[in-house]
Structures are given as C-alpha cells and as structure tokens.
C-alpha cells in the first residue's frame, strides 16, 4: 500500500500597518525618514483580526484561489478580512505548520509528513478609497469576509500586538516586521521594473524596430501582469516610447486611468548611443519615486534593463540582493517585473528588498 501523499495548503497574508493618528509622522509622513527606527516603531499601529471559529487573534491571511499568486491572495485576503484596501510593501517571511495545529497557541513546523499550511507574508499599507477605485478593474473584486470568519479587527501598537497575538508563529512574523522597519521598510518607496511582453521577432517583423508590437501571447502575459502590478498600487507609469513597451502597460494605464510618461532615453537605440544618459533618466525616476512617495512602474527593453542593473547592484544594501539583479542576458523574462523597495539615505538611494513578479497565464 502506498503512503498517503502530503497535502500543502498555500496561503498568503500580511502585517497591515499605518502611522498612529496624531503622531508627528502621521501629521507629516515626509519626516518619517528623519526619525530613528524606534521612533518609527513607536508611531506604528498594526491590524489584527479575530477569528471566532478558533477564538484567536492573528494576522489577516487566507488560502489562494485557483490561478492566483501569493501576492494577489495577500492583498485580496487582507481586503476581505480587514475592509482596508492595501498595497504590498517589502516581503517578510514564510510560515509553515501542520494543518492539525490550526488555531492552536503553539505551532511546530518540524513535522514534514503531516498535511501542512504554507503562508507567505508581506508588509502592507492601506491605500485611499480613490486609489482602490482606480485599481478595481486591474486587480479584481474584493468581498468583505463573513462575520462568522472575522468578527472583530483592532489597530494596536507593536508592543500591544505582542501581547494580543494568539500564536507563536504570528509573534515570530511580528519580529521579522520589526527587523524590516529597523532597516527602513516603513519609509521604503516602490519602483517596478517591467520588461515588455513577448514581441514579434526581429527576423519576421517587416516594420521599424520602434514599431515592433507584442504578440497575442505577449498580450495575454501583459494582461495577466496587470493583476500582479496592481498589488503594489502603481500610480506613476513610465515607459520607453517604443510600441512593445507601450503596449505592455497600455491596458493597465487604461484600467487605472493613469497616464504613461514616455522616456525617450530608455529606448534601445538611445541606450546604445548614450548609456550614461539613459542611467541619468532612470536615476531621475528613482528620485521622483522617493520624493513623491508613489509607486512607479517603468517598462523597458532587455539591453536597457541590463544596463540599469549594472548601476542598481551597487545600490543594494546586501550582496544577496545584488545577486537577484542578474548580470547575464536576458536579465529577466519577458512580461515580468522586478519590484524594488528603495530608501533614501545620506549616502543616496539604497535598495532593501527585491521581489520577482511573474503573472499566471491560463
């Protein structure tokens, strides 16, 4: 008789946080980066939900739906359980424990034979109702959880959260959150590097390279990528003016009613002729992202991305982050993105988190 196969239930969620009302930072968020990590932590509130089925307090989270990524599930589940539309921030951690221990105060993750729940967590921030409305078509609907699933939510300090959380694994995740804040996670701004979707081959295309379009398969990839980009609430869209880059972000621009800024210095020809000028144009987008505190998505070409990576690796806070910016062509697959979280330091921009963003095409 064959052994029973282990079942893994995939889930996702996050620690939703905000600046405490009345705090200096809440009154002027631009001052956050000038505060110490402890001052930031003292000014932060996190959201905890109560599950009547288990009579416990935990982070908002839930199971993945069919054809859904972890990041999309995290944003959707947080919205369903808290009523707050959010955008994702730096990644936190993964937690795994036997399903039989769901709802128990202490969880043990060492049993590799039992049916298991595997959950990924992010930092997440509430967004405005207006931003949520702009994202609706790209992200999809979010329906509030039934009172039988979640019957209470509270916003508490980090110190209070340690006392209220029911589970050891949730307290461990809170410790990771504190570490993230200490390295700048609460002031990090998000820049998404998008590689255009699959385009017609140079060999078969009879027009100019600037007018070479994406393929029908590429269009499907671009459409699916919109759902993933929406998880980060990109309110600024920028692109090389060449057609394949425009087409990759075009539907997202239409869905969110956000205009696309064309950056001539980010075309393949411009980069080949003046790579330093291309970097200065990209560097200006980093500055604008930090100053505006808005998420920016920039669509570019393979060789341009490789050139930008050469500079960005030097901005990474850790060597293992720099290794995620591949030094060998093609650098990243077509129709995907890299999500960079950047903080402003006296020495200049510093990248503290990098996430690969890939769509599910079905």
Model-identified regions with their sequence ranges:
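Active-site-proximal alpha-helix that buttresses catalytic centers in soluble enzyme cores
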Residues: 62, 186-274, 306, 316-319, ...
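Active-site-adjacent beta-strand/loop module that shapes the phosphate/pyrophosphate-binding cleft
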Residues: 96-139
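Non-catalytic terminal regions with compositionally biased, polar/charged low complexity
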Residues: 166, 171, 175-183, 187-189, ...
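Conserved Nudix-box catalytic region and its N-terminal flanking loop in Nudix hydrolases
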Residues: 36-87, 205-212
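A short coil-to-beta-strand element that immediately follows conserved catalytic motifs
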Residues: 85-95, 258-264
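Nudix hydrolase/Nudix homology domain
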Residues: 55-56, 133-195, 201
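Active-site-adjacent alpha-helix immediately C-terminal to a catalytic or transition-state-stabilizing loop
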Residues: 183, 283-348
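N-terminal strand-loop-strand
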Residues: 2-59, 192-196
């Amino acid at each position: 008789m064959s052994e029973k196969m282990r079942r893994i239930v995939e889930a996702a969620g996050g620690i939703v946080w905000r600046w405490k009302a009345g705090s200096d930072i809440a009154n002027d968020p631009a001052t956050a980066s000038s505060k110490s990590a402890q001052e930031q932590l003292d000014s932060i509130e996190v959201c905890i939900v109560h599950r009547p089925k288990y009579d416990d307090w935990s982070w908002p989270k839930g199971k993945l739906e069919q054809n859904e990524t972890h990041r999309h599930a995290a944003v959707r589940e947080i919205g369903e359980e808290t009523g707050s539309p959010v955008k994702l921030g730096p990644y936190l951690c993964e937690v795994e424990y036997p399903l039989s221990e769901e709802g128990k105060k202490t969880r043990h993750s060492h049993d590799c034979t039992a049916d298991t729940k595997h959950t990924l967590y992010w930092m997440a921030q509430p967004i405005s109702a207006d931003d949520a409305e702009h994202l609706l078509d790209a992200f999809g609907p979010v329906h509030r959880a039934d009172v039988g699933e979640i019957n209470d939510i509270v916003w508490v300090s980090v110190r209070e959260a340690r006392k209220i959380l029911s589970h050891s694994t949730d307290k461990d995740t809170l410790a990771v959150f504190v570490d993230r804040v200490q390295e700048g996670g609460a002031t990090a701004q998000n820049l998404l590097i998008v590689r255009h979707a699959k385009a017609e081959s140079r060999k078969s295309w009879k027009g100019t390279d600037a007018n070479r379009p994406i393929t029908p398969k590429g269009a499907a990839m671009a459409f699916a990528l919109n759902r993933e980009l929406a998880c980060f609430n990109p309110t600024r869209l920028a692109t090389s003016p060449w057609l394949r880059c425009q087409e990759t972000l075009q539907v997202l621009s239409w869905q969110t009613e956000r205009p696309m800024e064309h950056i001539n210095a980010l075309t393949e020809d411009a980069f080949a002729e003046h790579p330093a000028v291309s970097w200065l144009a990209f560097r200006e987008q980093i500055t604008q992202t930090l100053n505006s505190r808005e998420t920016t998505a920039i669509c570019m070409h393979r060789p341009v991305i490789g050139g930008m990576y050469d500079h960005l690796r030097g901005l990474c806070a850790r060597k293992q982050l720099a290794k995620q910016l591949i030094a060998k062509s093609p650098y990243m697959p077509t129709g995907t993105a890299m999500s960079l979280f950047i903080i402003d330091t006296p020495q200049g921009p510093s990248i503290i988190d990098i996430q690969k963003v890939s769509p599910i095409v079905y």
